Amino acid sequence: MRDVQNEKDYRGIYLRKVGIKNIHWPIKIVTKSGDYQSTVASIDISVDLREDLRGTHMSRFVEVLNGIDSLHPENLGKILQEVREKLRADSSHIKISFPYFIFKKAPVSQISSPNMVECVIDAELSKKLDMIIGVKVPIHTLCPCSKEISEYGAHNQRGVAEIYVRSKKLIWFEDLVEISEKSASAPIYSLLKRPDEKYITEMAYNNPKFVEDVVRDIVSELEKEPKISWYRVEVTSFESIHNHNAFACVEKGWVKK
């Protein structure tokens, strides 16, 4: 049978990434407590392609995924090495995006309910392994200006905090979620009874924050972790009384121009 992918290509153009995108795959994630959580991920996986080869072998990417029992940031290097070897490439890349559930107890009733966050692992293996992990966490913000100028009440709304980090040692998703929530006016819960709603409403009112405040508070916490070598933080507030969203962002290493 003719092997079209392995035919010679004479255009002399090296391709940085070739592979498959947005394949939905069942995975098991190792949690901070040592348990496993089953979820469904959207996965992009690729390799580089030499300038003298016409194509890569797409089915081999799925073969690698088919052999993965569980995912953990610490075993991604082994997975990427297998991808690189199977496809005879110099570099390999994988991006895994998935919903992740953290159980939280309501502040007064203590009723536990699952709360979803979006997680991502973005890793590349070339001469060495480079990996970024990230979370998107729903949060609650209350406007300090609105509180200051109003006789009573203040506009408040849901928002989302995004944190992406490079780390010399393992950082758990749960730790990034905790940093996001404690930097906001108040956390978000799936299930709240009336005493819980009263508690959270008053908590946010007593802790007003701009998106700028939330970003800076998150960064202050990340800077306490010497194992974090790089980060990017963005907070978006879905403004309740404006026809726009508000946002602020920062990346470690940015220089003021």
UniProtKB/Swiss-Prot annotation:
The UniProt keywords, alphabetically, are: Hydrolase
Annotated metabolic or biological route of this protein:
Cofactor biosynthesis; 7,8-dihydroneopterin triphosphate biosynthesis; 7,8-dihydroneopterin triphosphate from GTP: step 1/1
So what does this thing catalyse?
GTP + H2O = 7,8-dihydroneopterin 3'-triphosphate + formate + H(+)
Site residues, May be catalytically important: C143
Enzyme nomenclature, EC number:
3.5.4.16
Which Pfam families is this protein grouped with?
Answer: GCHY-1 (PF02649)
Broad enzyme group: hydrolase
Q: Which GO terms describe its biological process?
A: tetrahydrofolate biosynthetic process
Report the superkingdom from the record: Bacteria
Q: Name one GO molecular function term.
A: GTP cyclohydrolase I activity
Segments crossing the lipid bilayer: none
* Cited InterPro entries: GTP_cyclohydrolase_FolE2, GTP_cyclohydrolase_FolE2/MptA
Q: Which family does it belong to?
A: Belongs to the GTP cyclohydrolase IV family.
Entry function: Converts GTP to 7,8-dihydroneopterin triphosphate.
Q: Matching NCBIfam families, A to Z?
A: PRK13674.1-1 (NF010200)
Name the record gives this protein: GTP cyclohydrolase FolE2
Taxonomic source organism: Dictyoglomus thermophilum (strain ATCC 35947 / DSM 3960 / H-6-12)
Cite the source lineage: Bacteria, Pseudomonadati, Dictyoglomota, Dictyoglomia, Dictyoglomales
